[in-house]
């Protein structure tokens, strides 16, 4: 069979003696004319160097060692018969079939919108649309072909059309150049990328049209030569255009056209093979039975098939060489993705011609593409090839060359690409034995524990086929037998345990089970095999293996009962389907039926090990407990209750006690018929614990010393009671009062061990909460006041514990105190619960200060106060950090819910920058919520935080040389972060920023140096911190602040001999004119405002206007909007003449910016309401006085403007100083810039 053109032989084809078609010649000429450095092609470094292997780079001289051997076996296609005259490109001197030969046909411009509108609407059948066009084409070839061409032009977004006159007299390149010049690109969108519902389905309809066009023409016009060859030539030219719309649309059309041609070529190949078999069968007949006429017809048919196939191959070669070879590395990722997707389809559907190393290398090179969508198309194309075992065997060289890249893509930064890469490696593992090494597989093993479920599930499937399937599949013949074979199940469990132990992620069994759930769910839901291994004594399982097997059992039970991934694993699935819910209910029932009888046995066997008992007790959460009643399993319930009591008596670990209390809580629901039996067992257990507690408490209260055993026993009893008080209401046992007496003795005498204090605090706290749950509208006032008295007494005990020597007691007291204050805050009466008003409690100032002091001592710790980080394990440091974050979050809640004064937030805000890595998210959320509560007060708190830090620095270092200290630099960074927290709404925060500046100026000059001293005021350096807020000011406010600063400086008794540095820095931050002017002293700024004609104004007014103009143009310039269309260049000489043609008296000196006032000498700082800089008035029209533009508002008298702004400022001050609610300030609580700031 003649082979397609191979990219590796494009430079060897010139020596062939075969005659090329005009289409091939024109394409070859077009390729030679292409620039190698086209802007639309991605640069490929070192891809043209000689001696480089074909796989290493997409070289134009694409030779390789293995291609030489392949090329020797390829038969060269014989020369065709004299080809049909199919010009690929039109020239003026060469007439084409589209031009009428004097037959008198009217060459009117055809309708150019009919096909485009029909495809865009996608309402009609594409086959009928193409048939209608074919009918029109047969009636008038010229008009029909022009209609098709203009359809593709319109599909590119170009509103211009190709007329018959243009097509007769212009070549393809000239036509494309004309269309490019006429391309009116109002926006960057074109039909393939345009938004909106009308364009949503355009790409699919467009591709369907191209596909149908080839399908309907495969028995007629496809081999006619004229329409298809000319269309391909036009698409090749458009695909090399600089206009993105032309390049994108024509590449898509050419690739879809190529795909349709591949299908036609495949059918021709099948027909040709069938014809060959018929010919051989007819020829092998005897002379009497042989029909010469049939042999001759079969030979003619084979010749026709051969010619048609050569025509198809010629068109495919032209598209591949003219479009794909250049566009697969286009600068636009959408174009690259189209090319890779289509070549993958070619290889799958027509593997005999396309599945070779000459085409595979393009996919291999593109695996390194920087764009996600292109890499994804590459991996999916390869997955389609490797899924076929027959095709995968022909890709051995490609696999060896690009295997490392495919393995590395499992950790791609885009999860979607990583998922497909893992699936690709799974296909390679299944269909190509021995390709992936152990090191390659180990890179995938750890992915089963990551948070992204799609990646973890794909990795789980890979692990299943690599580790479990070879061993488990060998134990059974059929898939049904494999699922039921006990030996296969046992083998699976042992392999799973071995994999789990080697992974070193022993705390993440739930993640491992979830990863394997989709591919090995039947094994994991075989709870009978799992429990048999745990209960049988001859299994020789170690302690670690037993613990892991219990974790796997509990995790599989949770997965089956809940039907969703474990906490922390990301999944895009919203809810379960009806079928999944039905399966979930069935699994939950089977789980309960099997494990309810066995759970007491498991607890009895592993009751001594706390790490095994706690997860086993969690199994009750996944049972349908009604089965105890419906299936008469009360005897197993009795055994379970006995084991629960034994577990509680044996263990004091918090996780075991909490699991036991929760398990008993699940059984103690009144709707169960066995409730009375469970309640009786609970009462027995609590009676036993309370009796022991009373006896041990009496011993403690009567004696001044207890030995270690007595302390341990009392502590264990309190821990058990505290855990059960958390889940059960133990109010009727009245154990709160004895605990309160115990805590009072601990505070008064300090003789109570700290191990006893911790559970006693928690127990009293739970007793108060349970009492709150019993309150209703019928509760008497006396009962409410009694509860409040208990709460206040407990708060006093916790306040006393804040100063305890034991840090655990301090932190526990802080947490409990924060929760109680929050519960009994004014929020308690919200929602129509006014009857709870007597319980509202406001902490005193001493308690508030102690809470803030505790926060400073236990949360905002310096690195040296954290201890030796090397001596502590990482998980210990993480736990300590989480505890500190918990303390900080509790304090911030008290601030936001009005329990503490909002001004206390300054103790938190001032650490925002220094502790941003540890607590940045908490402080940021607190700052956002505080601004929603009161914008004005929140701004004052930010300023207060800076004041506190500055005062502390002054006290430590003194006022001299502050600005060079690292601590002051950190304060500037904090001020900058505070400024960013105001967000982009400059007008919304205008009054707040101005107020902050005024208060900051007052603070900087609040303390003056001693009389006769030459030193600057000690707080003057605070102005440098204020300068970080200057970018948030409006230009008018900056001028007013300069005037306000001048008035404040007038009160300074003695002015310096030289300008004070902080004052100069602050003035520069309010005066962006100087920086702008020095940066570009010549040349007018580009402004769209109208020029103001007329004589020069007085110097002061001119300075004000120039400053305003420079301020408006001092920001970053707008980036140029680059159009892909080629625009006609405007002569620079013409622009120069226009500039010279402006009227003016004559040449003058260039504009200069001259400082009119400086901060000089021994006199006071000279500042006026006018700006500090003025611009020399140039009488000539070319100066800044003429070229700089002004707003019409600035033509008002400046003094009047300043007076109005000053009045507005004073009104803003009155509003800021008056108490008001956030709603009175017009705060938008749903403002996205307030809630989701990304820059601070």
Swiss-Prot record:
InterPro entries given in the database record: ARM-type_fold (IPR016024), Cohesin_Scc3/SA (IPR039662), HEAT_SCC3-SA (IPR056396), SCD (IPR020839), STAG (IPR013721)
Compositionally biased residues, Basic residues: 1126-1141
Residue ranges, compositional bias (Low complexity): 1-25
Reported phenotype of the disruption mutant: Deficient mice are sterile and their fetal oocytes are arrested at early prophase I leading to oocyte depletion at 1 week of age.
Maturation and modification: Phosphorylated.
Subcellular localization, as worded in the UniProt entry: Nucleus; Chromosome; Chromosome, Centromere
Composition skew (Polar residues), residue ranges: 97-108, 1115-1125
Keyword check for Zinc: no
Tissue specificity annotation: Testis specific.
Residue list for modification Phosphoserine: 1218
Origin: domain of life: Eukaryota
Location of the SCD domain: 324-409
GO biological process: establishment of meiotic sister chromatid cohesion; female meiosis sister chromatid cohesion; homologous chromosome pairing at meiosis; male meiosis sister chromatid cohesion; protein localization to chromosome
Region Disordered: start-end pairs: 1-108, 1077-1154, 1213-1240
Record key words, sorted: Cell cycle, Centromere, Chromosome, Chromosome partition, Meiosis, Nucleus, Phosphoprotein
Cellular component terms per the entry's GO annotation: chromosome, centromeric region; condensed nuclear chromosome; lateral element; male germ cell nucleus; meiotic cohesin complex; nucleolus; nucleoplasm; synaptonemal complex
Pfam families: HEAT_SCC3-SA, SCD, STAG
Complex and partners: Component of the meiosis-specific cohesin complex, which also contains the SMC1 (SMC1A or SMC1B) and SMC3 heterodimer. Such complex likely contains RAD21, or the meiosis-specific related protein REC8. Interacts with CCDC79/TERB1; recruiting cohesin to telomeres to develop structural rigidity.
Recorded family membership: Belongs to the SCC3 family.
Described function: Meiosis specific component of cohesin complex. The cohesin complex is required for the cohesion of sister chromatids after DNA replication. The cohesin complex apparently forms a large proteinaceous ring within which sister chromatids can be trapped. At anaphase, the complex is cleaved and dissociates from chromatin, allowing sister chromatids to segregate. The meiosis-specific cohesin complex probably replaces mitosis specific cohesin complex when it dissociates from chromatin during prophase I.
Protein name as catalogued: Cohesin subunit SA-3
Organism: Mus musculus (Mouse)
Encoding gene, per UniProt annotation: Stag3
